[in-house]
From Swiss-Prot:
Annotated S4 RNA-binding domain residues: 98-159
The protein's role, per its UniProt record: One of the primary rRNA binding proteins, it binds directly to 16S rRNA where it nucleates assembly of the body of the 30S subunit. With S5 and S12 plays an important role in translational accuracy.
Quaternary structure annotation from Swiss-Prot or TrEMBL: Part of the 30S ribosomal subunit. Contacts protein S5. The interaction surface between S4 and S5 is involved in control of translational fidelity.
Protein family: Belongs to the universal ribosomal protein uS4 family.
One of the GO BP terms on file: ribosomal small subunit biogenesis
One CC-aspect GO term: small ribosomal subunit
Protein name: Small ribosomal subunit protein uS4
Length: 209
């Protein structure tokens, strides 16, 4: 299955929840979901009864689309989460937040995870002083992400940083705006991962069938 390249606002409408795929636009009344809070297409406003399986499948699609993963990649993360100690659904969310592209987004270097992935691949970041261009690189507590010197005048990065300074950062990361440097302080806990509001247990139930 190829990666989706169409209008990302349609994905939020399809899932009937904000997936925060469009940067600052998602926080304004220009958000497509604010204007049309129903699925796209001719029958988008129609009411249909959704089965338990359908509800579970939708939740999986929401999480996959939020983190920009294909089914094979997502299933690999789930299998790893399932093999770990603790609650599988919570483990899954933590693994996804530990991706470098997610950390770049959470720190505000990118306005969306998709943009974060592109910036990582283009080699704009150092992790603990070493260039890393793999979006799935696994972050560890106290890892330091630094924007390379030659990238610090890029307008879209500075705009994204200004945006996150207004909105605030999640508790598991820390940003030094002036130094273009951020720290992945600790592993996030479930209570802190509130946006988007996933029901990860539905995904566990789906894959456990």
């Amino acid at each position: 299955m190829a990666r989706y390249t169409g209008p990302v606002c349609r994905l939020c409408r399809r899932e009937t929840m904000k997936l925060f795929l469009k940067g600052d636009r998602c926080y304004t009344d220009k958000c497509a979901l604010e204007r049309r809070n129903y699925a796209p297409g001719q029958h988008g406003q129609g009411r249909t009864k959704v089965s338990d399986y359908g509800t579970q499948l939708r939740e999986k699609q929401r999480m996959k689309r939020t983190y920009g993963l294909l089914e094979k990649q997502f299933r690999a993360y789930f299998d790893k989460a399932d093999s770990m100690k603790g609650v599988t659904g919570e483990n899954l969310l933590v693994l996804l937040e530990r991706r470098l592209d997610s950390a770049v987004y959470r720190l505000g270097f990118a306005s969306s995870r998709t943009e974060g992935r592109a910036l990582v691949r283009q080699g704009h970041f150092l992790v603990n002083g070493r260039k890393v261009n793999i979006p799935s690189y696994v972050m560890r507590p106290n890892d330091v992400i630094e924007l390379r010197e030659k990238s610090r005048k890029i307008t879209r990065i500075n705009d994204a940083l200004d945006g996150v300074m207004r909105r605030g950062l999640p508790s598991w990361v820390e940003l030094d705006r002036e130094a273009f440097k951020g720290t992945f302080k600790t592993l996030p806990v479930r209570e802190e991962m509130t946006t988007p509001a996933f029901q990860e247990q539905l995904i566990v139930e789906l894959y456990s069938k």
